[in-house]
């Protein structure tokens, strides 16, 4: 381990000194028996007061003489002789405390002067407006509820180090209003989705997180062991097969918002643990799903942000406009127009072009790949990142869609779509394959690919086949990446910005 630089060492020494001084203050509070009281109940919150009395002038507030009780974290403090001010932040916003020895008593005032930024404080008093027009609480009672032993980051620089923001999210939330706004928007978006689904007569369900067989997606699972049953199990990579079992069982519209786990890489748009919403509706197809998904995302934006027109990384997006629909080859030729129809149907050309673009076509997934899979790989290299406006890419090849229904009109193509916005996938849906014999044959092909070295190929799920043999009605199903959707709505460039506690390497 390398030695810290002198500035780092100096900062650490300063912080250690501050912590030591604060521990001494806490020790004194313990000696007085008042270290961590738990008998204060706020009657109001900062944002509510700021909103309700935004237009009330000084005279109106004085006449009303509203008694309030407010608690929160002290973010700023100005001691000015016989009158002091503190900016206090609760879960809703900030409000100013006005403190004088005449109102709270000399002993409390002297104690207040020794309190530190970051301390959790509480006050009772009367709401008023200062001569400078600041809505404030004129404190008649002031208490320290919890001592902060560690100092907050400098108010002008905040948490400059991005990794520290992720690792110490609790500090980031304290000092960064934008972070708090991001996660409030996330909560609003998820609440909007739940209401949208409920209004459409969907039932929310919970399915297992531990699976005896990983299924429902092409991904590498996390493996664990169930001690009581003495069996290998897998953290789920997708809830799909369980949700479709519920369709078989007679629940005709179901959805689940929960975690999936995939033992794969970390990137600005990938995290091994992530939140998905999957939903399934009997007697629908992929066209119905696209219409429904478009309306759902539009409504989530309106409910979370108040508008369907958003800005992402400096560019405007109008989610109120109809989403485009393109086939894979149409998208390739739109963004790479030099490719001809003949070239896009030529196995040797596609393999050579992919190799030129840096794709390793010798990996197991490409060994027996057909034209459709090669076209999809070329789409990912040439067009995917260009799909800024919301776009449904449709007509996916059957060989990369083992759970999707084959088209009635075009052999080798499935009734499947993926929704792309700002160059990244947001949703994936299709008309479900409900033919048990066809599904079993596709599972067997997946097993062959797994035996050939493709770690992401699916297992054969005999119980799922048994469920289909009881009969599943025509069904449409879709998965929406909640984290990526929130990235879009909150102008967040990386998935870590929308996860409260993203995975990081250990601190060593």
Swiss-Prot record:
Report the record's Gene Ontology biological process terms: lysyl-tRNA aminoacylation
Q: Which reaction does it catalyse?
A: tRNA(Lys) + L-lysine + ATP = L-lysyl-tRNA(Lys) + AMP + diphosphate
Alphabetized, the UniProt keywords read: Aminoacyl-tRNA synthetase, ATP-binding, Cytoplasm, Ligase, Magnesium, Metal-binding, Nucleotide-binding, Protein biosynthesis
EC number(s) recorded for this UniProt protein: 6.1.1.6
| Localization (cell) | Cytoplasm
Which InterPro entries does the annotation name? Aa-tRNA-synt_II (IPR004364), aa-tRNA-synth_II (IPR006195), aa-tRNA-synth_II/BPL/LPL (IPR045864), Lys-tRNA-ligase_II (IPR002313), Lys-tRNA-ligase_II_N (IPR044136), Lys-tRNA-synth_II_C (IPR018149), NA-bd_OB-fold (IPR012340), NA-bd_OB_tRNA (IPR004365)
Q: What is this protein called?
A: Lysine--tRNA ligase
Please name the gene that encodes this protein.
lysS
């Amino acid at each position: 381990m390398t030695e810290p630089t002198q500035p780092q060492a100096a900062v650490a020494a300063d912080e250690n000194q501050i912590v030591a001084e604060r521990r001494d203050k806490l020790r004194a509070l313990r000696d007085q028996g008042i270290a961590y009281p738990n008998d204060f109940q706020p009657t109001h919150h900062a944002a509510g007061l700021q909103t309700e009395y935004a237009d009330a002038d000084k005279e109106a507030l004085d006449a009303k003489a509203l008694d309030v009780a407010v608690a929160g974290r002290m973010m700023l403090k100005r001691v000015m002789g016989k009158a002091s001010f503190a900016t206090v932040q609760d879960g809703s916003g900030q409000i100013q405390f006005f403190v004088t020895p005449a109102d709270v008593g000399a002993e409390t005032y002297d104690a207040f002067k020794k309190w530190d930024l970051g301390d959790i404080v509480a006050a009772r008093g009367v709401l008023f407006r200062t001569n400078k027009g600041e809505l404030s609480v004129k404190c008649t009672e002031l208490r320290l509820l919890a001592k902060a032993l560690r100092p907050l980051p400098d108010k002008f620089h905040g948490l400059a180090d991005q990794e520290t923001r992720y690792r110490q999210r609790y500090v980031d939330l304290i000092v960064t209003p934008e972070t708090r706004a991001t996660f409030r928007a996330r909560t609003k978006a998820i609440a909007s989705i739940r209401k949208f689904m409920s209004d459409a007569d969907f039932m929310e369900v919970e399915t297992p997180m531990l699976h005896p067989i990983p299924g429902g997606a092409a991904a590498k699972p996390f493996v664990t062991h169930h001690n009581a049953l003495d069996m290998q199990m897998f953290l789920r990579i997708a809830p799909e097969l369980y949700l479709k079992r519920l369709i078989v069982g007679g629940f005709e519209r179901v959805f689940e918002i929960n975690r999936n786990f995939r033992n794969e890489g970390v990137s600005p748009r990938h995290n091994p643990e992530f939140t998905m919403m999957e939903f399934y509706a009997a007697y629908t197809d992929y066209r119905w799903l696209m219409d429904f998904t478009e309306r759902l995302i539009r409504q989530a934006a309106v409910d979370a942000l108040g508008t369907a027109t958003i800005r992402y990384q400096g560019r405007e997006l109008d989610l109120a406009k109809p989403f485009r629909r393109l086939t894979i080859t149409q998208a390739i030729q739109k963004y790479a127009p030099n490719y001809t129809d003949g070239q896009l149907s030529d196995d040797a050309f596609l393999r050579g072009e992919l190799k030129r673009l840096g794709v390793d076509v010798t990996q197991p997934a490409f060994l027996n790949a057909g034209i459709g899979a090669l076209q999809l790989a070329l789409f990912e290299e040439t067009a995917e990142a260009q799909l800024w406006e919301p776009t449904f890419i449709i007509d996916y090849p059957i060989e990369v869609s083992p759970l999707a229904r084959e088209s009635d009109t075009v052999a080798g193509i499935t009734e499947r779509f993926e929704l792309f916005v700002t160059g990244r996938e947001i949703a994936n849906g299709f008309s479900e394959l409900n033919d048990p014999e066809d599904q079993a044959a596709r599972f067997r092909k997946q097993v062959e690919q797994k035996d050939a070295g493709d770690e992401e190929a699916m297992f054969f799920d005999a119980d799922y086949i048994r469920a289909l043999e009881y009969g599943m009605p025509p069904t449409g199903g879709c998965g929406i990446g909640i984290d990526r959707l929130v990235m879009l709505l909150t102008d967040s460039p990386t998935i870590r910005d929308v996860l409260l506690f993203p995975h990081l390497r250990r601190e060593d």
